[in-house]
């Protein structure tokens, strides 16, 4: 995707920034109990895990995770742990490289699901939230998965036309 490490870092930071502000903007339209979270950044992670085999990608995602923790959560350790570990897990599946667009869409949905669940478990473990799991699933996880599946489908349709899948 982007072979230059500095351009890749800037692209990842811009994607993370767009995600944060898009999430905040979308939450203005809903009731305060609904929390919609945009994860275009995770789509980029899956796409780069598939096409960029460089080891420096781990360091880039650790740096972006650290900056995302400071900017979004104001606590270090949540996304700086999850981003490189998700990249590692994605690279451990050799069949992941041979997927068609529908399978890639399902991988993006699974990554979104596991990221949200892992983030909730870590936040609950560190006592950053007292939000019950049932409310988390109903008011945050389900709307976020629906929104991110729609966005991922649009992005995959655009990329599949570009890559002639």
Q: Where are the predicted features?
A:
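Terminal, non-globular segments
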Residues: 1-165
């Amino acid at each position: 995707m982007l072979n230059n490490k500095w351009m890749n870092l800037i692209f990842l930071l811009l994607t993370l920034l767009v995600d944060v502000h898009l999430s905040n903007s979308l939450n203005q339209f809903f009731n305060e109990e609904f929390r919609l979270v945009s994860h275009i950044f995770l789509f980029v992670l899956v796409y780069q895990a598939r096409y960029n085999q460089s080891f420096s990608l781990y360091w880039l995602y650790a740096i972006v995770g650290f900056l995302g923790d400071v900017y979004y959560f104001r606590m270090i350790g949540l996304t700086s742990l999850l981003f490189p570990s998700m990249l590692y897990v994605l690279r451990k599946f050799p069949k992941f490289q041979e997927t068609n667009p529908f399978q890639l869409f399902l991988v993006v949905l699974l990554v979104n699901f596991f990221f949200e669940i892992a983030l909730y478990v870590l936040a609950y473990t560190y006592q950053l939230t007292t939000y019950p799991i049932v409310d988390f699933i109903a008011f945050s996880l389900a709307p976020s998965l629906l929104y991110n599946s729609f966005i991922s489908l649009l992005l995959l349709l655009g990329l599949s036309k570009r890559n002639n899948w």
